[in-house]
Amino acid sequence: MAPKKKEVTRIAKLNLIGGQAKPGPALASVGINMAEFTKSFNDKTKDQNGKVIPVIITAYKDKSFDYVVKTTPVTYLLKDAAKIKSGAKDPKKQVVATISKEQALEIARYKLVDMTAYDEEAALRMIAGSAKQMGIAIEGVSAYKEKKGN
């Protein structure tokens, strides 16, 4: 006979700082052993210390938990590459920074595991679209795919 499945009580999506998670209100609301989670999370993310890391926590009725660590959000990576604190207030009219195509490709390669893109070129276009919405230009890259024909 197959083992019984655990009953899920909550699935929480949180953004935590790599290597620096602490027990607090956000974790308390999930209903897990916070000390055990923070120790495990900090050990797993110690190489990404200080970066914002999305995590999906599945809490079970018996107070046990599973979690999945995702890659850092594109907006944080773009701001870090451009060395800015925030994007443009009006990105259609204002460009606050420019990054190189190599920097954008590096971000695309890093994010490819969490994206729906099948190759680096498609991932680069997605990164370019996010950058455009933040008022960040990428040298030699358009946020839009050129139309063939016409």
Curated annotation (Swiss-Prot):
Coiled-coil portions: none
GO molecular function: large ribosomal subunit rRNA binding; structural constituent of ribosome
Matching Gene3D superfamilies: Ribosomal protein L11, C-terminal domain (1.10.10.250), Ribosomal protein L11/L12, N-terminal domain (3.30.1550.10)
UniProt-listed NCBIfam families: L11_bact (TIGR01632)
GO process annotations (BP): translation
Record flagged with keyword RNA-binding: yes
CDD domains, per the entry: Ribosomal_L11
Lineage, highest ranks first: Bacteria, Bacillati, Mycoplasmatota, Mycoplasmoidales, Mycoplasmoidaceae
Keyword Ligase: no
Protein's name in the database: Large ribosomal subunit protein uL11
UniProt keyword list: Methylation, Ribonucleoprotein, Ribosomal protein, RNA-binding, rRNA-binding
PTM info: One or more lysine residues are methylated.
Function comment: Forms part of the ribosomal stalk which helps the ribosome interact with GTP-bound translation factors.
Membership in a protein family: Belongs to the universal ribosomal protein uL11 family.
